[in-house]
């Protein structure tokens, strides 16, 4: 399963409070996990393993709160444990 950004959005990110910024990017990437951004109260303290099906591909699913300061570190941590 692969993903790519539309040409007009490649190398751009919207950062709340800063606007649209230029960033490095990849032309295409393999999707290997799903991060579901949920309300803080919906993030389980110790979650059971979860997955979701996207176009027949079963991927690990994690529920995180986007505005927790630790969210980027959590995403990196779970991504590093794949394979």
Predicted regions mapped to residue ranges:
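Conserved nucleotide-sensing/catalytic segment adjacent to the nucleotide-binding pocket
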Residues: 1-39
């Amino acid at each position: 399963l692969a993903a790519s950004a539309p040409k007009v959005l490649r190398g751009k990110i919207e950062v709340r409070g800063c606007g649209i910024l230029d960033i490095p990017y990849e032309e295409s990437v393999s999707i290997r996990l799903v991060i579901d951004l949920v309300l803080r109260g919906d993030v389980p303290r110790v979650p059971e393993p979860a997955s979701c099906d996207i176009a027949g591909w079963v991927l690990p699913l994690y529920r995180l709160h986007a505005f927790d300061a630790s969210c980027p570190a959590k995403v990196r941590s779970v991504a590093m444990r794949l394979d």
